[in-house]
Amino acid sequence: MKHTIIENEPEIKLQNDLNHHIEISPNTKTTNGTTTTTTTLNVNKTLKAIDLIETSIKNHISTIDHENCLPNDEDSFFVCDLGEIINSVNQWQQILPMVQPYYAVKCNSNPQILTTLSELGVNFDCASKNEIDLVLSLGIHQAHERIIYANPCKTNSFIRHAADENVNLTTVDNVHELYKLAKFHPHCKILIRLITDDSTAQCQLSTKFGCDLNTAIGEILPKAKELGLQVHGVAFHVGSGAKDFSSIYQAIKDSRILFDEMLSMGFTPKLLDIGGGFERETFPQSSQMVKFALEKFFPIEFSQLNEIKFIAEPGRFMVANAFTLITHIIARRDLPTGGNNNNNDMTPSAMLYINDGVYGNLNCILFDHQTPKVYVLTNENQLFYKQEMMRSLSVNNNNNNNNKTDGFKFSIWGPTCDGLDCVSSLAKLSKNVQVGDWLFFENVGAYTSCASTKFNGLSSGETKTLYVNSNEE
């Protein structure tokens, strides 16, 4: 089939298109030589949110006497601002209204979060039987129709379970998966997952999932035709934390090629899944590339004629900034260099041990390439949440990464007996904190609690979460 939309496209022109549409300030948009202001995402907390979170924290920790409390009373806990999740959904709908979000349940499977997202019209990306069952258990009307089983390599029993629950949309990237679907779920709608260039992403997925165009066209489509399966469209994922958004352009371009092949073979593809990996801080750039590529390769005329819809699988975009983790300092060990707080000295004065770490809710440090910022919550029986947040906002708003305020340097360690359980090799705190004080970590809603373990028997189970809503009047 002749692909007239991309045939003989000069590489220089392509690069100029990309530069023109994406390598510009997030605060401006240039169209036909005219520059206008575009949406800027505000990822800072409002004063109302800060006050609500501080009050919630204060009410909880004021009941805890770390010297006399019962075991686990002083455990780490989360505060979740549901208003921040509402803001995330609103921003998505304002900037990418043509793309229906399917929240990646694996990112944070908190039932309250899932319910809130459902009420806001968000659907769900599930990767296992348990995730499917969790969404189905929430009492959402026609929940099975709002799930994509987005795992290209599935257990046979899970496929049968999806069929039993009428979850009828999934992804594949190999012929062997087609045989399983033909046997256990023959009426399931299939998206072929393409491999992408995610070399600039912090969390790369193409080393594990996705097929190239040749495999999709030469192997998967013919076999799906032979087996009588419903090929419903294309899926891809460019990885999380990407900085080069040209990979989105290329993936959508490849998707159009595959759509054309599907149409030429008699399939009726209706869905393009552009995956996840979106972050609020870079959403103006990534979303702009999505819109540009969709306009170029899936123009309105083509999409309307073939009734094509677009979906995505955002996870961290929706929940990362909504969660604050509060941890307790359970031990301190002063080092021989203690007391030297010269700002040029990069040696910690003491080691702090907290009751959460990389085997718990801070596993994102190891497995998600995150470096969560730590702040002082209490010291000498005083609460510093608002003060710390206001200082942080001031630094961010002034675009000043060189905080000249004197501080105390510590290394911070989790509670397990593993030397790998290091939260921070060097953290600069505003106070000389002691055993019994509390610390807090901001923006830890994504890939944290969902991957915590019970290593060393130090976890008492699900971490307590307190809820506020800064979006309420």
Curated annotation (Swiss-Prot):
Its cofactor is pyridoxal 5'-phosphate. The record marks 237 as: Stacks against the aromatic ring of pyridoxal phosphate and stabilizes reaction intermediates. GO terms for biological process: pantothenate biosynthetic process; polyamine biosynthetic process; putrescine biosynthetic process from arginine, via ornithine. Inhibited by antizyme (AZ) OAZ1 in response to polyamine levels. AZ inhibits the assembly of the functional homodimer by binding to ODC monomers and targeting them for ubiquitin-independent proteolytic destruction by the 26S proteasome. GO terms for cellular component: cytoplasm. GO terms for molecular function: ornithine decarboxylase activity. InterPro entries: Ala_racemase/Decarboxylase_C (IPR009006), De-COase2_C (IPR022643), De-COase2_CS (IPR022657), De-COase2_N (IPR022644), De-COase2_pyr-phos_BS (IPR022653), Orn/DAP/Arg_de-COase (IPR000183), Orn_de-COase (IPR002433), PLP-binding_barrel (IPR029066). It is an enzyme of class 4 (lyase). It is found in: Cytoplasm. CDD domains: PLPDE_III_ODC. Pyridoxal 5'-phosphate binds at residues 240, 277, 313-316, 447. Pathway: Amine and polyamine biosynthesis; putrescine biosynthesis via L-ornithine pathway; putrescine from L-ornithine: step 1/1. PROSITE patterns: ODR_DC_2_1, ODR_DC_2_2. Its EC number is 4.1.1.17. The modification N6-(pyridoxal phosphate)lysine is found at residue 106. It catalyses: L-ornithine + H(+) = putrescine + CO2. Keywords: Cytoplasm, Decarboxylase, Lyase, Polyamine biosynthesis, Pyridoxal phosphate. Gene3D superfamilies: Alanine racemase, Lyase, Ornithine Decarboxylase, Chain A, domain 1. Homodimer. Only the dimer is catalytically active, as the active sites are constructed of residues from both monomers. Belongs to the Orn/Lys/Arg decarboxylase class-II family. Catalyzes the first and rate-limiting step of polyamine biosynthesis that converts ornithine into putrescine, which is the precursor for the polyamines, spermidine and spermine. Polyamines are essential for cell proliferation and are implicated in cellular processes, ranging from DNA replication to apoptosis. This is Ornithine decarboxylase. It comes from Candida albicans (strain SC5314 / ATCC MYA-2876) (Yeast).
